[in-house]
Curated annotation (Swiss-Prot):
Cited InterPro entries: TPRA1/CAND2/CAND8
Protein name, entry field: Transmembrane protein adipocyte-associated 1 homolog
Cysteine-cysteine disulfides: none
Compartments (UniProt record): Membrane
A single GO molecular function term of this UniProt record: G protein-coupled receptor activity
GO cellular component: plasma membrane
Annotated glycan sites: N4, N17, N30, N33
Gene name as annotated: TPRA1
Amino acid sequence: MSDNITRSTALVTALENVTTLSPTTTQAINDTNITVPHKCLLLLYEDIGKSRVRYWDLLLLVPNVLFFMFLLWKLPSARAKIRVTSSPIFTTFYILVFVVALVGIARAVVSMTVSASDAATVADKILWEITRFFLLAIELSVVILGLAFGHLESKSSVKRVLAITAVLSLAYSVTQGTLEILYPDAHLSAEDFNIYGHGGRHFWLASSCFFFLVYSFVVILPKTPLKDRISLPSRKSFYVYAGILAVLNLVQGLGSALLCVDIIEGLCCVDATTFLYFSFFAPLIYVAFLKGFFGSEPKILFSYKCQVDEPEDVDVHLPHAYAVAKKEGMDSGFYSSTQIDTTAYLDDVALYALSCGQHQQHRQ
């Protein structure tokens, strides 16, 4: 009898212990089964301390602020160079780079100040799309203007190119924004805040592959038979620019493909490419195409003109895009020296103005 009582007591105690431990055990199991946000997803929405400022927004804000301050510092000399040359292409690029830096700053600041409400999320995504619109417009403009430099003769032709790129960029951004707002990607949601997903994994993959093919084709153009039929930019920086964007889109496409097959590590790839693109694309444009133009020292004051009256839509003397050397005796290598060869262009303008001034003095 005593043994039975002892066994019964032990059984009751064991059951009580199981009952007591069951909620804790269940909670631990539930915590394990809950999808813990990946560190690359956590980076996109985690706040700094108790503030509403996210690490991601701060990472994107700092480079844009620094670059904008640099543009302001260079503004006086840049305006002087633009007034001297009256080049619509360089003026347009400079304005677009300025706008991209401003929009990037505005997007980050607004995202830092809004709450996690649905309206704030939509506003944040719209700002992302506006930024993407300007970046893509510059992308397309650089490619088209770079490849068609030898065929652009007036301001009106440059305006037509910009209009076409604006329409294409708008169509892309509207499509991406519609997918992003109406059909958000569930894989890019965290807590009560839906992360900007660039139109979703599948749209991201398709667009990345498309742009990778475009930029890869631009890079290999000088190796194709087309080099004998069309004038190609020979400035190395043009192809370096295209190569960088090709690699960027390749990595972004691989990351998107991993996300499409539910491999969350792909998010780390697209995080890196997104940060590089939205933070350093505008500086890349400046270094590749505008640095030489604004940084070259003028050889002479450009205040002498041989002609006083000019028509309203005067031909623009654009820097020539020379064909890649392919004949005997033209030992210029694979990429030589002029895509948008701004230094040589300014030298030509200076020599032309100097010769005109000397001619007038001789006549007097």
